[in-house]
Amino acid sequence: MASHKWLLQMIVFLKTITIAYCLHLQDDTPLFFGAKPLSDVSLIITEPCVSSVYEAWDYAAPPVSNLSEALSGIVVKTKCPVPEVILWFKDKQMAYWTNPYVTLKGLTQSVGEEHKSGDIRDALLDALSGVWVDSTPSSTNIPENGCVWGADRLFQRVCQ
């Protein structure tokens, strides 16, 4: 039963990503940062953080019409200065790095949309709500050249 709830939450989450991507067409906030061909999902963890090789990445959205059918998994890398959220497509052997702020906000909203309570939902809501309580409004735009994300002010841009 718990696995069914998780599946339903992921479907809602993927719909939220799709909606956010459609909104991207009208907004300057990109959802997808870059794409890279990788033969195995385990290679995602060994990749350097996007922020350290930013210029080398191609901007691309997954070439699929229905993310929920083609998506094989979601990886969250927390070892980077800014956590990274990566969508993995096994059939295409491609990984797509997403805007972590937009993606995590979509995850928070999708978990919150389910009206039935359950152990998994409650645990996720508790964990995710703590993240957003103390956060200040921040730009989800990609930093311009010469800008870095300050470690002490993770959610603010620092430009020289």
From Swiss-Prot:
SS bonds (residue pairs): 49-80, 147-159
Region (Interaction with gH): 24-149
Membrane disposition: Peripheral membrane protein
GO cellular component, one term: membrane
Gene Ontology biological process: fusion of virus membrane with host plasma membrane; symbiont entry into host cell
Entry's transmembrane regions: none
Keywords carried by this UniProt record: Disulfide bond, Fusion of virus membrane with host cell membrane, Fusion of virus membrane with host membrane, Glycoprotein, Host cell membrane, Host Golgi apparatus, Host membrane, Membrane, Signal, Viral envelope protein, Viral penetration into host cytoplasm, Virion, Virus entry into host cell
This protein's record includes keyword Disulfide bond: yes
Main location: virion
Localisation: Virion membrane; Host cell membrane; Host Golgi apparatus, Host trans-Golgi network
Pfam families in the record: Herpes_UL1 (PF05259)
Signal peptide: 1-22
InterPro entries: Herpes_gL_N, Herpes_gL_N_sf, HSV_GL_alphagamma
Family named by the database record: Belongs to the herpesviridae glycoprotein L (gL) family. Alphaherpesvirinae gL subfamily.
Protein purpose: The heterodimer glycoprotein H-glycoprotein L is required for the fusion of viral and plasma membranes leading to virus entry into the host cell. Acts as a functional inhibitor of gH and maintains gH in an inhibited form. Upon binding to host integrins, gL dissociates from gH leading to activation of the viral fusion glycoproteins gB and gH.
Subunit and interaction comment: Interacts with glycoprotein H (gH); this interaction is necessary for the correct processing and cell surface expression of gH. The heterodimer gH/gL seems to interact with gB trimers during fusion.
Protein's recorded name: Envelope glycoprotein L
Protein species of origin: Varicella-zoster virus (strain Oka vaccine)
Gene: gL
